[in-house]
């Protein structure tokens, strides 16, 4: 069995008020749910998904992220799909939609964005949403 690498499917929930439905769906598919809080906003996604959150950020989140002390944490809820199989991703998206689970932004963890912080991912998702909105408005 040497050389086999098992990657566990995970979901990162940020700013999602009621995760009960997501947790229920994930449990049925053996997907782990990680609830990211404000102290993780400046953590790299790779660290969050692998449980390697810096103790400095846990203890001193206000000194590391001054925007959080100004109550400027984004209002958007974010769901990040980490290493889900195509089958599980499709099923999860279908179930979330059919159960009317409200999530503002969704993303898939990629080799590129896994080195980003949650803040950087949020900024990029905001840019993409604005770009789509502008394109739709022009058409």
Language-model segment annotations:
Residues 2-59:
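N-terminal, charge-rich interaction modules
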Residues 10, 20-24, 28, 89-136:
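Helix-rich interaction surfaces within compact, conserved domain-sized segments
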Residues 25, 53-66, 72-75, 85:
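Long, folded non-catalytic interaction modules
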Residues 33-54, 64-67, 99-113, 117-118:
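A cross-kingdom feature marking solvent-exposed beta-strand/loop segments within repeated
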Residues 67, 136-138:
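Extended alpha-helical surfaces
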Residues 67-99:
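Mid-chain, well-packed structural core segment of small domains
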């Amino acid at each position: 069995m040497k050389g086999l690498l098992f990657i566990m499917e995970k979901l990162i929930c940020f700013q999602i008020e009621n995760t009960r439905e997501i947790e229920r769906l994930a449990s049925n598919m053996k997907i782990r749910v990680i609830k990211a809080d404000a102290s993780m906003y400046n953590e790299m996604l790779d660290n969050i998904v692998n449980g390697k959150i810096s103790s400095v950020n846990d203890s001193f989140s206000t000194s590391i992220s001054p925007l959080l002390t100004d109550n400027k944490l984004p209002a958007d809820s974010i769901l990040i799909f980490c290493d889900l199989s195509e089958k599980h991703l499709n099923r999860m998206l279908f179930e979330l939609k059919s159960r009317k689970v409200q999530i503002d932004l969704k993303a898939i963890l990629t080799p590129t964005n896994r080195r980003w912080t949650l803040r950087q991912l949020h900024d990029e998702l905001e840019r993409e949403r604005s770009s789509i909105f502008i394109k739709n408005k022009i058409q």
